[in-house]
Amino acid sequence: AFFFPLKKGRLKYDFELKRNLKDDMKHVFMVQTDVQVSCQEHLDSYRSYVGKARAFMEKYAKERDAFVLDCGDIVGNTPGLYPDYIQVSGGLGLPVYRIIGNHDMEMGVRSFEHSYKTYEDYFGPIYYSFNRGKAHYIILDNCFYINRDYRYIGYIDERTLQWIEKDLALVPKDHLVFVMMHIPSSTTKDIKFNALLPDETSNANSLYDLLKDHEAHLITGHTHVNGNVVFNDRLMEHNTAAVCAGFWKSMLCSDGTPQGFGLYEVDGNQVKWHYKAVDYPLEYQFQAYAPGSSKEFPEEVLANVWNWDEQWKVEWFENGTCMGEMTRCKGLDPAAVEAFSDREKMGALWVNAFPTNHLFKAVPKDKKARIEVLVTDRFGTVYKQLVKAVSYTHLRAHETEADL
């Protein structure tokens, strides 16, 4: 346990601290979010995911300090499954620090202050912080229950803002700061301040102001898609795709991002990050589609680059000749369209494919040409795919590294 519940009238708490035997200046953490289990079938699927994630993380944990951050929606309005989730997530074999999500709140209670009581009984405080090397981690609750049926907004209350201000006053300016919360601060640079939004944080500007003296990374979930927003040279948000992907009905998220987790490698006050599709090697960072795969773009080669930001480069080659960079566009991922097309299987109408802005297109001169897509991430790592016909069924066949 990393916390002790305080009891009224008790003045003394005895506990033993365990020394970290590894140098935490170099450490690694995985970010999972929106596990959202609501039945035994979901728990079984999550158990399978946990086994794969553990197998991948073991090589890092042998050499470095390693842990897990869970960005909320642990369950799907089913707090009775907290003990089962705890048991299954223990299979990761790493310490897990959790963040409350909107589906983890108690509904029907009289105020926001009562909405997180059951969560705290199982997982401890809704906001806290800790250090690893030259990195400072802040865990927040920005799911603000407004006591109308199942209504909530993204909002950080004044009590928490005052605590953040005091907390950061103790953090050296040259240390990295990671802020973990469930609802994104903003999904675009066009921040909608002071709007009552359930999918963004209405007073995010107050948080940004507190972070202005630090290099900070916001890490969030909630949307069930993957995306990055670079606000400026010192502030960036990473919105992480869902573990439950298509609500356990599909292993693709609605934007075409495969089920997986964020991987962050910290060295001093420097950090590198990747998205790890749980069923594929780390080198699988995008999916290319041949012309004819999309009804929206029938003539185009497409590439869905799920962890893209402005410092990535997406190029394409026709018969070995570099044709330049592909054009970013907004559209539907073809495999996601196929995966979500079985409406009977999907159930709810809102479980569907949604347009993404990390899609890229190009029109080949020769439809029979050999087309390759080459993607370079912000850290200089290059990924390449030969374009061929791809379907959701094909993706679920778990392509080998050679295929990619």
Question: Could you say what each language-model-derived stretch is?
Answer:
Residues 79-173, 194-219, 228-267:
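Extended active-site neighborhood of metal-dependent phosphoesterases/phosphodiesterases
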Residues 171-189:
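Short acidic, glycine-rich surface-loop motifs adjacent to enzyme active sites
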Residues 321-336, 348:
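Short, surface-exposed loop motifs enriched in S/T, G, D/E and P with embedded aromatic residues
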Residues 235-308, 312-319, 357-366, 370-386:
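Binuclear metal-dependent phosphoesterase catalytic core
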Residues 334-361:
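Aromatic sugar-binding surface patches on proteins
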Residues 393-400:
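Conserved small/polar residues in nucleotide/adenosyl-binding loops
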Residues 3-82, 367, 395:
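N-terminal active-site segment of His-dependent metallophosphoesterases
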Residues 34, 72-73, 101-102, 182, ...:
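Active-site glycine-centered loops adjacent to acidic/histidine catalytic or metal-binding residues
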